Amino acid sequence: MKTIAVEQAVFTSTDRGPIKGYQLVAKSAGIDRRLEQELSRWSPTRGFRDRPVDWSLNCFPVFEDLTAITRTTLGGPEYSGRGGTQIVTLILVLRSDQLEAYDFNPITLAQTAMALGLLKLPLDLNCEQLAPALLPADPLIQNRCSHRDDAARSEAQILSQIAALVAEGRRAAVVGPVDPIATADRLIHSLPVESRRDFSFTTGLEPSLSRPFVVHFLSHASAAVQRTLDAQNVVCLNASA
């Protein structure tokens, strides 16, 4: 099987070294200082407040020719011993030509990576130097969107609204009881390939000025989250309506 080598990194809290707190604690050799700073900017230091979700899949472009596909999950207790839970973000970084083999669909690539044990805990977080991650040059997961079920059909209107907003260069948040992975997958398949190159989304991270995702998927939005979305001119779409 032909494979591709992609860069990988881990962002979490640590008390190792002169700087304590959240940072890239492990990375492969191709991640330089500039890329490290950008990956750190997009990676959260707070978890899934007031929500039952314990992990999130995220994707965002990095510079002109790179895309990061990340999975944020809960780790063990934080080193501070104050009772907090460690947030861990597992990161893969791909060139455009590598992602093109997956039709610029980060969901397909993430599912393939997870099937091979990547983007998952446990990792040896004491190892600062990681080898590049090896992935199939072509996806292992077939397109599951060709057969649309009743749930998918019921989301057709909201998917159409999101696609229209994306085409206008606007941002959106889907709030309500949807399957975020499946809905994001259907949305990506509905977008032209050229629109997928710079598309970004998160299936669970709360909005932040440092993480301007094009589309958020949120199970619900508290008053504080709603204010943040409004301040960033993010259009909220109610999936329960």
Locations of regions flagged by a protein language model:
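Extended, helix-rich scaffolding/adaptor regions
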Residues: 1-143, 179, 195-201, 205-209, ...
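Extended, charged alpha-helical interaction scaffolds
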Residues: 132-163
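Conserved, folded interaction/cargo-binding domains in eukaryotic regulatory proteins
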Residues: 153-238
